[in-house]
Amino acid sequence: MSADCLNAHLRKTLARGRVAVSRPAGCERIALYLFDPTVLEGPLSHEEAQAVVAEPAYWSFCWASGQVLASWILDNPGWVEGKRVLDFGSGSGIVAVAAAKAGAREAIACDIDPAALDAASANAALNGVSISLCRDWA
């Protein structure tokens, strides 16, 4: 996966949407492709706002819970080293990436949104780690 693929996903919702490489606050050891706010030159039109609400790109933001957990994993690698780790509802994949960086035997990003799995894959590659992807944990 690449930034181009993620940009294509974003543009399904917001025509001017794109990703940029970011390092989330509190977890600067991980780089992620996230929504680039510089594309917003003003307020969203009514149609754009409706599209964002109808099909939100949750994966294009790094949620605080993921940032905190990823940082904790990197600070405490012994908890995941050599183990199989599941990042359930992975979104950007930050927790799976952190687990892989911390030495997990396998880090699995699981999300029902195919675009989120593309984001997790792209973010793993950006950080030089390998993760597994799972669309449905049944």
Q: What positions do the PLM features span?
A:
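SAM-dependent Rossmann-like transferase core, predominantly class I methyltransferases
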Residues: 25-80
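Conserved SAM/SAH cofactor-binding pocket of Class I
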Residues: 65, 71-137
